[in-house]
Design a protein with these regions (language model features):
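Positively charged, proline/Ser/Thr-rich regional signature most characteristic
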Residues: 235-312, 316, 355
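Active-site HxH/HxHxD metal-binding segment of metal-dependent hydrolases
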Residues: 13, 24, 34-110, 127, ...
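Accessory terminal helices/loops
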Residues: 155-169, 173-259
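Core dinuclear metal-dependent hydrolase active-site scaffold
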Residues: 6, 18, 98-124, 128, ...
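Divalent metal-coordination and catalytic microenvironments
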Residues: 19, 31, 58, 70, ...
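Active-site metal-binding loops of divalent metal-dependent hydrolases
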Residues: 32, 59, 83-84, 114-115, ...
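Catalytic cysteine-centered active loop of the rhodanese-like fold, especially the PTP/DSP P-loop
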Residues: 294-347
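Conserved beta-strand hairpin/beta-sheet module of binuclear metal-dependent hydrolase folds
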Residues: 1-50, 121-132, 138
């Protein structure tokens, strides 16, 4: 079975794509974003797959790649086009190469035009392709910087992408209107820049008169991406919480396991967000836990110290996850949710006050 997830970075409107072989438990990630690396690593962990490689469709100008961060955390190989000009990759790709994950693979098609090193990745059965910034949904990427060439882009799209089967689904690196997927058949017919009977000279004339401003992050993103996302020597690396062993979930929440909470409880504020009848009910409560029901937590955050870590607790971990987000938005920096809540706490034999034996 193929694992497929389309992931989104709202800051840069970038799509990243996770593809995996469920039976072999191997996966690849196309166009990871630096700020989303923690999220992506959490998803990969939850799906139980090994990330064997990150793949870039090109050297991006609007965001920094998460390739190096993911390699640092998960050991994945950094992979991109040999024509990209980037340094520090583990594998440089050429037209016709294959990137394997389990029994599946992506075929590399050189599609220069947006940049000189653009590639499109085509799944082995040609059911889907990942077009980067070369072909967008009812549009195309720009071709006015980073060795861009509108003639090359036109030829790339016409010869390497729109020659795929009509039913082949196309997934771009960006969309700014909330669109998520298109198909070869649709783009052949409806793409106003590259579809139908539009000729090369028509496309070149259109692209040469776009007059677009350069991406805001180009002076940061391009140099960083030419290093495959590796930070400069004096740059600060993302800091993991050091007050307890925590796990970052795909839901965007830090979780603490019962054993870790028990071991570090002396330095932690525990806030129980259940209702009073639950707090005094059969499950009991953790020693020292302060009762502040979720419904009134926003109004009572002043009762919690901001210079000490906070762990939110409820029956199962659902309400306390919401409480964790609320506290983060209220300016608390060190917040975690008790994984599994009081149900798991008791099931694992940790001490409680009150409750039924």
């Amino acid at each position: 079975m193929l694992i497929f997830r389309q992931l989104f970075d709202p800051q840069s409107s970038t799509y990243s794509y996770l593809l995996g072989d469920a039976r072999a438990c191997e996966a690849v990630l196309i166009d990871p974003v630096f700020e989303q690396a923690r999220r992506d690593a959490a998803l990969i962990s939850e799906l139980g797959v090994k990330l064997v490689a990150t793949l870039e469709t090109h050297v991006h100008a609007d965001h920094v790649t998460g390739a190096w961060l993911l390699q640092r955390q998960l050991g994945s190989a950094i992979t991109l086009s040999a024509a990209s000009g980037a340094e520090g990759a583990d594998r440089y790709l050429a037209h016709g190469d294959r990137v394997k994950f389990g029994r599946r693979y992506l075929e590399v098609r050189a599609t220069p035009g947006h940049t000189q090193g653009c590639v499109t990745y085509v799944l082995d059965d040609e059911s889907m392709a990942f077009t980067g910034d070369c072909l967008l949904i009812r549009g195309s990427g720009r071709a006015d910087f980073q060795q861009g060439d509108p003639r090359a882009m036109y030829r790339s799209v016409r010869s390497q992408i729109l020659t795929l089967p009509p039913a082949c689904l196309l997934y771009p690196a960006h969309d700014y209107r909330g669109l998520t997927v298109t198909s070869v058949g649709e783009e052949r017919r409806y793409n106003p820049r590259l579809g139908g009977e539009i000729g090369e000279s028509d496309f070149v004339g259109y692209m040469n008169n776009l007059g677009l401003p350069h991406p805001k992050l180009i002076d940061i993103a391009v140099p960083a991406n030419l290093r495959c996302g590796h930070p400069e020597k004096d740059a600060a690396l993302p800091v993991e919480p050091g007050w307890a062993p925590l796990t970052f979930t795909f839901a965007g929440i830090w979780e603490i396991q019962p054993d870790a909470l028990e071991e570090n409880a002396a330095n932690i504020q525990i806030v129980d967000v259940r209702e009073p009848d639950e707090y005094h009910g059969p499950l009991g409560r953790i020693h020292g836990a302060k009762l502040i029901p979720l419904g009134v937590l926003a109004a009572r955050t002043g009762e919690l110290a901001r210079d000490r870590p906070v762990v939110a607790v409820c029956r199962s971990g659902a309400r306390s996850a919401q409480a964790s987000i609320l506290l983060q938005h209220a300016g608390f920096n060190d917040v975690a949710n008790l994984a599994g809540g009081m149900l798991r706490w008791r099931a694992e034999g940790h001490a409680v006050e009150g409750g039924q034996a």
